[in-house]
Structure formats: structure tokens, C-alpha cells
Amino acid sequence: MRKRIDILIKSGVSKVFICSNTPHVYFDELQSQVKIEMISIVDETLNRISSLGLKKCGLLGTKFTMSKGFYSSKGMSTGIEIIVPNETEQDLIHSIYMNELVFNINNQDSKIKLIEIISRLIEEEGIEGLILGGTELSLIFDQTDFDTIKILDTCIIHVDSIIDELV
């Protein structure tokens, strides 16, 4: 990824955006190595959560995104608690994500399973919001599927911040 960023810098870009959640595990390391501003999907999502006054949010995404803690560690530093599904649920979410959503397959049975996981996070963990920490997750549900929590689509949040930066 560093080589690609170097190519972008040589081409004259003024900012770099990594428009995917999972690679953000390397974001801070990359940012420290380059002399160009990088806009983080994680930071922008946490900024949005903070602006909404939410303190406890669930996180769905690839198993890597859910388990590596880069949302949780940055969230803790801003007073936002990030709750991830248990390991069995993470395996199911990852399977649906990699075997269906990345291929644009919208399976209603899978949607029901995901909603059951989210419902558990609402009831047992008290989440106030849900981070769609995988850019394909918005293919299967959005805010209209939930009335008690705020859905935070990281892709939309990141694009909004990119537009704000460039306008």
C-alpha cells in the first residue's frame, strides 16, 4: 500500500483516502511514513459518532475489522465504546460478507441472521449506534431497518468527509 501512496504523491495529489475499512489497521503506520494528509474512514466515523452524542456503538465488518481493535482503540481515546459481536457471530458475519455481499448477493435469510445479531447487541450490550464497518454492508440493510439505533455507514461518512475536504 505504501508504494501506491508514493505513486499518488508523485502524481501530485494533495490528500490520500483509503476507502475501505480493513486496510485501516495500517493507517497510522502509513500516515507516519508519508508527508501528505490522509483522511481516515475510522477517524471520520468516530467524529460522526461523537457529533451525534453516541457513546456506545456496535461494529460489523470483516472478521479482521471486528477483531483487530483499530476502531475500539481509537474509540476509547475519544470516549466511545465499540462493541463487537462474539467470535461465533463474527465468523457468521464474515462468511456472509465474503461469500455473499462482496458478490452483491442480497440473501434475506442472511439479513435476518445479521439483524438477530444486531438485536442482541441492542438488548444485551445497549448499543446506541451500529457502525457498518464494511463498505458492502449497506447493500443488505440501512437506517430504515432500525428505529432504536443510528446506522453509521462508513462509506457514506467517508465520502461526505472527502467532499468536505475537497470543496
Report the location of each language-model feature.
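Non-catalytic structural scaffold of enzyme domains
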Residues: 1-167
